[in-house]
Amino acid sequence: MDGRIKAIGVSNFLKSHLEALSNITDIVPAVNQFEISPLNTQKELIKYCQDNGIAVQAMSTFSHFRSTEPRLEILENTKLKAIGLKYNKSVVQIVLRWLLQQGIIMIPKTWYIPHLKENIAIFDFVLTKEEMTEIDSLDRGMFLNYNPYGQQQGFFRMVRNNEEFKKWNETHPANFILDLIDQIRYKFSI
């Protein structure tokens, strides 16, 4: 590809979007950023990305715009606390280590220096296979922040009926991708 762009990254792309992209262009995203947490492990999408050479970046692992309940459900989880106690680590450190051991890129957000130091202190222990499985078992498919199944027809048009969107998306996944590629080509003259 001639031009200024050497790599693109995408956000909240589902497997169907990535498949549609690969069907209409030779562009392979360098990274797909999407929500991953113990309550929503996204194993199938992670595997698809990693199998196709797309780096996975976790976002919104702890955040929630509307309520603190799901966030607290992670931070107060007894299984995560027990694992943390074993290593003398916080629940946040356990979850960050869980992401790291899956080969997932993470950018934990903080403005508070003690939290930054806490986030960095995850390289002096390794979770066992059993502990990784135990954390995976918390999965409920619960989005803490952004649910791509309910908010992604065309460019950011809200869809009221999730089932309606899923049906549309299964039959027209390339529409979203084509719109995106056109926007990229227009913006960067490629």
Predicted regions and their residues:
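Beta/alpha (TIM)-barrel catalytic core signal, keyed to glycine-rich beta->alpha loops juxtaposed to Asp/Glu
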Residues: 1-190
